[in-house]
A protein has these predicted regions:
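CBM-like, beta-strand-rich accessory domains located in the C-terminal region of large
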Residues: 1-191
Length: 191
């Protein structure tokens, strides 16, 4: 399948012994995965922040968040290495144009005692359900399950399609070992 992947880091916390690495994976044009990994000394509480267009209506659900805008709707779910994730909805000032601040819907997602957070956003084409299921990640060469601090996997079922995503947080095996979920294995940091 086709996908787009970007990886970068934020060095603003290096003086505190923390390097933030962000990976963004776009699967087709309607599934976006944002994975933040804190390297070094992990902060006790980690967070991700999101701002939305002023016309978007947000509602929390048992699975995460639903959003409805002027032309689209979306679902968001949040994961933090099996730790509890808290959501806080509010508003925040945002400038889309020079010197024109507006209050827009804002979401903060927090978790404690984790080294990574993953947000999965699915742009919905209809009202059919979106299912995002955490999956155990396996190393085929050593025939064992990796712990969430080593890797996390997700199966995303939406818009009539099914995708699997794996994030490795540390090297597991060597460059010839396969890591994966649901019987599908591949090389690299993201499959």
């Amino acid at each position: 399948g086709e996908y787009f992947f970007v990886e970068g880091s934020h060095t603003g916390y290096v003086a505190q012994g923390i390097l933030l690495c962000r990976r963004i994976l776009v699967v087709s044009s309607d599934i976006f995965v944002i994975n933040d990994t804190w390297i070094g000394r992990h902060p006790r509480e980690t967070s991700q922040h999101f701002h939305f267009a002023e016309t978007v209506r947000l509602n929390t659900t048992s699975q995460g968040l639903e959003g409805i805008g002027a032309t689209s709707r979306f679902s968001m779910q949040f994961f933090a290495q099996e730790q509890f994730v808290r959501m806080k909805l509010g508003t925040a000032p945002l400038a889309r144009h020079y010197n024109k601040m507006k209050q827009v819907p804002d979401l903060t997602v927090n978790a404690e005692n984790c080294g990574a957070m993953t947000t999965i956003l699915v742009r919905r084409r209809d009202t059919s359900p979106v299912r995002i299921t955490p999956q155990s990640v396996y190393n085929e060469a050593y025939s064992h399950e990796l712990v969430p601090q080593q890797a996390e996997g997700f199966v995303i079922e939406a818009n009539g399609r099914r995708h699997g995503v794996v994030f490795l947080y540390q090297d597991v095996g060597n460059t010839e070992d396969y890591n994966g979920i649901c019987g599908a294995y591949g090389l690299g940091r993201v499959i």
